Every structure is written in structure tokens, then in C-alpha cells.
């Protein structure tokens, strides 16, 4: 096994997880902040806002999980070796 390929795979795995976490992290923070603001403005719509928020947070978190899957594939099922 080429050590350069192994080192590049480890670096790519770290970048995959790190970069895949930035966007959803910012999006989740923004969505949660807007949900709290919406509930503060209209308390009677809390259930609807909360349900929509939880669904959107799940979709955003899926992006991070995809990055983790790519990183695990690079580390343990490396197609470049």
C-alpha cells in the first residue's frame, strides 16, 4: 500500500467530515433561531413551527451523516488502494 495514498485518504476523510459539518451547523443554528423567534411572535403556532423545525433539522443532519459515510469509506473501504 502506497503511504502517500493512505495519508491523502486520512486527510480527505477529515476534510469530508469537517466540511460536511459546516453548512448544516450554520443552517441548524439559523433555523433554530428563527423558530424561537417565530414561536415568540405567535405562541399559538408553536406545534406547527416545532414540527417543521424538527423535520428540517433531520434533513440538515442527513448531510453531515453523508459526509461521515464518505469519510468511513475512505478510511476502511478505500477504493484507491
Swiss-Prot record:
It comes from the Eukaryota. Keywords: ATP synthesis, CF(0), Chloroplast, Hydrogen ion transport, Ion transport, Lipid-binding, Membrane, Plastid, Thylakoid, Transmembrane, Transmembrane helix, Transport. The record marks 61 as: Reversibly protonated during proton transport. The chain crosses the membrane at residues 7-27, 57-77. GO terms for molecular function: lipid binding; proton-transporting ATP synthase activity, rotational mechanism. InterPro entries: ATP_synth_csu_bac/chlpt, ATP_synth_F0_csu, ATP_synth_F0_csu_DDCD_BS, ATP_synth_F0_csu_sf, ATPase_proteolipid_c-like_dom, F/V-ATP_Csub_sf. It is found in: Plastid, Chloroplast thylakoid membrane. GO terms for cellular component: chloroplast thylakoid; chloroplast thylakoid membrane; proton-transporting ATP synthase complex; proton-transporting two-sector ATPase complex, proton-transporting domain. SUPFAM superfamilies: F1F0 ATP synthase subunit C. It is a multi-pass membrane protein. In plastids the F-type ATPase is also known as CF(1)CF(0). Dicyclohexylcarbodiimide (DCDD) inhibits ATPase. Belongs to the ATPase C chain family. F-type ATPases have 2 components, F(1) - the catalytic core - and F(0) - the membrane proton channel. F(1) has five subunits: alpha(3), beta(3), gamma(1), delta(1), epsilon(1). F(0) has four main subunits: a(1), b(1), b'(1) and c(10-14). The alpha and beta chains form an alternating ring which encloses part of the gamma chain. F(1) is attached to F(0) by a central stalk formed by the gamma and epsilon chains, while a peripheral stalk is formed by the delta, b and b' chains. F(1)F(0) ATP synthase produces ATP from ADP in the presence of a proton or sodium gradient. F-type ATPases consist of two structural domains, F(1) containing the extramembraneous catalytic core and F(0) containing the membrane proton channel, linked together by a central stalk and a peripheral stalk. During catalysis, ATP synthesis in the catalytic domain of F(1) is coupled via a rotary mechanism of the central stalk subunits to proton translocation. This is ATP synthase subunit c, chloroplastic. The gene is atpH.
